UniProtKB/Swiss-Prot annotation:
This is NAD(P)H-quinone oxidoreductase subunit K. SUPFAM superfamilies: HydA/Nqo6-like (SSF56770). NDH-1 can be composed of about 15 different subunits; different subcomplexes with different compositions have been identified which probably have different functions. Belongs to the complex I 20 kDa subunit family. It comes from Picosynechococcus sp. (strain ATCC 27264 / PCC 7002 / PR-6).
Length: 243
């Protein structure tokens, strides 16, 4: 067997000029080896095993509990409900948060290990909902207590909306890097609300209508329009004079 000296010299020259040349990957190797980065591998492991903390204070939690059933099956996302904050990395606040419950919520959040995420579910959690106008104990937004990553509006939101929020949270986790987490202990792109500019209005249920004349006696215009004479026993002194 005689080798071509010209081709051999070209190969040696190519090795000297480009010693780190790209090696040829065989077909079998390309089908059995996955190339990735440490960030992608780490984020894939975290987004595939989000463990939510069971925390519900009102009717919104019933919709979250529906995810545990076979119809929605949120186990396919790797979600495993936990009862201890030390084993959870996601807290889904579902329901009204009161002033008395606020310190307990903050304590649960602080006991969760980093990195941790928060989802605010329902109108009562986000803004106070139906209790935002006249309640003296409801917190007007859970983002006044802890930072929130995602909001799920609704009263209450359907389980499909919760699944959509989980998918968006998984996308957020997949875009994080280890360098950002090592430089900053606090997570970025989280939301704290500002003070609400609420106006004080006169209460509606004051009880003053009980003392009005029309409460016991219909007005004269109404009786004339309906053609129903009022019995004399029900007439007041002023109405008797007018009659």
């Amino acid at each position: 067997m005689v080798m071509n000296p010209t081709s051999f010299e070209q190969q040696q020259t190519e090795k000297l000029l480009n010693p780190m040349g790209r090696s040829q990957v065989t077909q079998d190797l390309s089908e059995n080896v996955i190339l990735t980065t440490v960030d992608d591998l780490y984020n894939w492991a975290r987004l595939s095993s989000l463990w939510p903390l069971l925390y519900g204070t009102a009717c919104c939690f019933i919709e979250f509990a529906a995810l545990l059933g076979s119809r929605f099956d949120f186990d396919r996302f790797g979600l495993v409900p936990r009862s201890s904050p030390r084993q959870a990395d996601l807290i889904l606040v579902a329901g009204t948060v009161t002033m008395k419950m606020a310190p307990a919520l903050v304590r649960l959040y602080e006991e969760m290990p980093e990195p941790k995420y928060v989802i605010a579910m329902g109108a009562c959690t986000i803004t106070g909902g139906m209790f935002s106008s006249d309640s003296t104990t409801a917190v007007r937004g859970v983002d006044k207590l802890i930072p929130v990553d995602l909001y799920i509006p609704g009263c209450p939101p359907r389980p499909e909306a919760i699944i959509d929020a989980i998918i968006k949270l998984r996308k957020k986790v997949s875009n994080e890097t280890i360098q950002e987490r090592s430089l900053k202990t606090e997570q970025t792109h989280r939301y704290y609300s500002t003070a609400h500019s609420m106006k004080v209005v006169e209460p509606i249920l004051t009880g003053k209508y009980l003392g009005m004349d029309t409460w016991n006696n219909p007005p004269k215009e109404l009786t004339e329009a309906m053609g129903m004479p009022v019995p004399p026993a029900l007439l007041t002194a002023k109405q008797r004079e007018e009659a």
